From Swiss-Prot:
Disulfide bonds: none annotated. Its main location: periplasm. [4Fe-4S] cluster 1 binds at C41, C44, C136, C172. Belongs to the [NiFe]/[NiFeSe] hydrogenase small subunit family. It holds the Pfam family Oxidored_q6. It is found in: Periplasm. This is Periplasmic [NiFe] hydrogenase small subunit. The gene is hydA. It is an enzyme of class 1 (oxidoreductase). Residues 1-23 form the signal peptide.
Length: 288
């Protein structure tokens, strides 16, 4: 119930909604998830694997039914291909991690001799909902940075012509609670309200700057001038060191990672990792 309360609060519903979360996640048939990998570093899966409330074993065995995930599966080769084909016969949520290479006919990204676009095009349109997890899946990520030789794009750009409208859980990596909260919303209330970038407003409705614990220093004109400076040690605002918090929509200051910490609290400027094309638009990441 502690986890259900945390999810309810993250969704903006308050602790009173926790029983509904519990009901959705303890149904006889747990929500089936088919998780596809494309051009990425697996950092989004790493973030999910390192969640502590619940731990990943509880998450994939008790909360959701992870019926296909190439990183977690014990099988390989033909057996895994068969598992995918069986999983997409039923009612499932498709989660896509990583950008989709479209250049040269999809040559730059293949699994089992099939290109990543073809696999996603087979699976995603059959799902009752599609979630693009991480900035690579949502906007292309680092693979799409100039000059983008592989022609990598986000899920909606690649699959939109097939009628796919993915929910974008942006971030590099995203907070796993934003993913779980989205699944819960789909189960209890249907499609969440999305912003113009396709992100759930309940998680991406405010800027990092709006909720930053260093905001008082920004308003007072108190800025860290260099890393390791006395001002930095006092927790002064990191804006002059390159912080992109005013331009970045995410709930990092509220949700933290594993409810423990987040980059700005640890002394590192926000790099706008949940924004479209952040590798190109927001480089260089440091001003010092």
């Amino acid at each position: 119930m502690k986890f259900c309360t945390a999810v309810a609060v993250a969704m903006g519903m308050g602790p009173a909604f926790a029983p509904k979360v519990a009901e959705a996640l303890t149904a006889k048939k747990r929500p089936s998830v088919v998780y596809l990998h494309n051009a990425e570093c697996t950092g989004c899966s790493e973030s999910l694997l390192r969640t502590v409330d619940p731990y990943v074993d509880e998450l994939i065995l008790d909360v959701i039914s992870m019926d296909y995930h190439e990183t977690l599966m014990a099988g390989a080769g033909h057996a895994v291909e068969e598992a995918l084909h069986e999983a997409i016969k039923g009612d499932f949520v498709c989660v896509i991690e990583g950008g989709i290479p479209m250049g040269d006919g999809g040559y730059w990204g293949k699994v089992g001799r099939r290109n990543m676009y073809d696999i996603c095009a087979e699976v995603a349109p059959k799902a009752k909902a599609v979630i693009a997890i991480g900035t690579c899946a949502t906007y292309g990520g680092v693979q799409a940075a100039k000059p983008n030789p592989t022609g990598t794009v986000g899920v909606n750009e690649a699959l939109g012509k097939l009628g796919v409208k993915a929910i974008n859980i942006a971030g590099c990596p995203p907070n796993p609670m934003n993913f779980v909260g989205t699944v819960v919303h789909l189960l209890t209330k249907g499609m969440p309200e999305l912003d113009k970038q396709g992100r759930p407003v309940m998680f991406f409705g405010e800027t990092v700057h709006d909720n930053c614990p260093r905001l008082k220093h920004f308003e007072a004109g108190e800025f860290a001038t260099s890393f390791g400076s006395p001002e930095a040690k006092k927790g002064y605002c990191l804006y002059e060191l390159g912080c992109k918090g005013p331009d970045t929509y995410n709930n990092c200051p509220k949700q933290l990672f594993n409810q423990v910490n987040w980059p700005v609290q640890a002394g590192h400027p926000c790099i706008a990792c949940s924004e479209p094309n952040f590798w190109d638009l927001y480089s260089p990441f440091y001003s010092a």
